[in-house]
Structures are given as C-alpha cells and as structure tokens.
Design a protein with these regions (language model features):
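Acidic/polar loop patches that form or flank catalytic/metal-binding clefts of enzymes
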Residues: 40-41, 62-64, 102-107, 160-161
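Functionally constrained cores in energy, signaling, and assembly domains
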Residues: 61-63, 70, 75, 104, ...
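Structured loops at beta-to-helix junctions and adjacent beta-edge loops in soluble globular domains
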Residues: 74-76, 107, 134
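Flexible glycine/proline-rich, aromatic-decorated loop/lid segments
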Residues: 1-6, 19-23, 98-126
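Active-site C-terminal subdomain of aminotransferase-like
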Residues: 1-89, 94
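Active-site lining segments that contact anionic ligands and/or coordinate catalytic metals
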Residues: 66-70, 91-93, 99-102, 125-130
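Glycine-rich beta-alpha junction loops
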Residues: 68-69, 77, 110-112, 137
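PLP-dependent enzyme catalytic core of the Aspartate aminotransferase-like
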Residues: 35, 99, 111-183
C-alpha cells in the first residue's frame, strides 16, 4: 500500500484528496467561493428566470417557481397525447435534442424504474424534463435559443402521437444506460 501511494501522489494527488488533483481542488475552491457571492447568485438566478419567463411567455408548461440551477418542463402538459407507458418525458427530451441539439434529462417513469418485485413500470405523478444550466457557460442569447426551440416544438406538439419503447435496460438504475426505439 505504501509503495502504491507514491504513484498515487504523482498522478492523482495526495491519498487523502479523494482522487482529486491539486488543480481540480483549486477549481472546486474557486467555485465554492463564487457560489457565496451575492452578485454571482443574483446573476445565476436571473439567468434561470430569464429562460423560465420566456417559456411562460410562449405558453410552454414549466414548473414554477423557477429554481437556481434548472428549468423543469412539464411533459404531462406538454405532450399529453403520448401515452405514459411510451415515456413521454423521455420522448420530449429526445425531441429537444434532435430538433435543437439541447440536452435535458428525463425525470419521470424511466428514472422511477420498475417495481423490484413485479418488474412493472412505476408511474410518478410528475413527468418532467430537467434543463440544468451549467454555470459560467451560457449567455441569455443561448437561453433565448433554448426558449425559441421549445416554442417551436410546443407549437407542433399535436403531431406527437407516440413515444418510445425500451429495447435494453439495466436491472437497476436503468435511466443511465437504457436504450430506446421510436414507436
């Protein structure tokens, strides 16, 4: 163990650093410090709210009040024409990526996984798509693009009649690696 720790120090940092090198720990410290500054927090919350308000203006169903890191699209209201067992939130997330190159994540039936005994899907009350906004990365012009893309998808939502079927899934935590096929 002692001989191996020498190499650990050279390649990953000190053995008590949890596998993080000094550069990464420094970046983490900067991020933690920034996240306590009022101006940063105000700017961050305003950017998320900017996107949320645009979506509300366009009639796109979102969860309110807006948070400080993400906007949550309400897939049950966005695409009610897609049956729940065809993963409507996942279908919406895929459509957003295909149409606009915008990545979101399904927070719904896929994430809720199957009942461990019956292996049937568990259907949560909410079917959401989370649009997490990375910090210090995007401008309000990017947020306007996201909003316009979602408006276009929402305006053509009546064309969405079917969703997806899972063709491969892990026995637990399927949402990380499941594979889907369009119905």
């Amino acid at each position: 163990f002692k001989k191996a720790t020498v190499f650990n120090i050279m390649f990953e940092g000190f053995i008590t650093y949890g596998g993080m090198n000094g550069r990464d720990m420094g970046a983490l410290a900067v991020g933690l410090n920034e996240s306590t500054e009022f101006n940063y927090l105000e700017s961050r919350i305003e950017q998320v709210a900017f996107l949320g308000k645009k979506l509300v203006e366009y009639g796109v169903p979102v969860q309110q009040p807006f948070g400080g890191h993400a906007i949550f699209l309400d897939a049950n209201k966005f695409v009610p024409s897609i049956p729940r067992d065809e993963y409507r939130a996942q279908a919406l997330a895929i459509e957003l990526y295909v149409v606009g190159g915008i990545r979101g994540v399904e927070i719904g039936t896929v994430l809720a996984d199957r009942d461990p005994f019956t292996r049937k899907n568990r259907y949560p009350e909410l079917e959401l798509v989370r649009l997490a906004i990375p910090r210090r990365t995007y401008t309000n012009n990017h947020m306007a693009y996201v909003a316009a893309t979602l408006k276009n998808i929402y305006d053509s939502r009546d064309e969405a009649k079917s969703g997806y079927v899972i063709v491969d899934e892990a026995p637990i935590m399927r949402h990380f690696t499941a594979k889907f096929s369009k119905i």
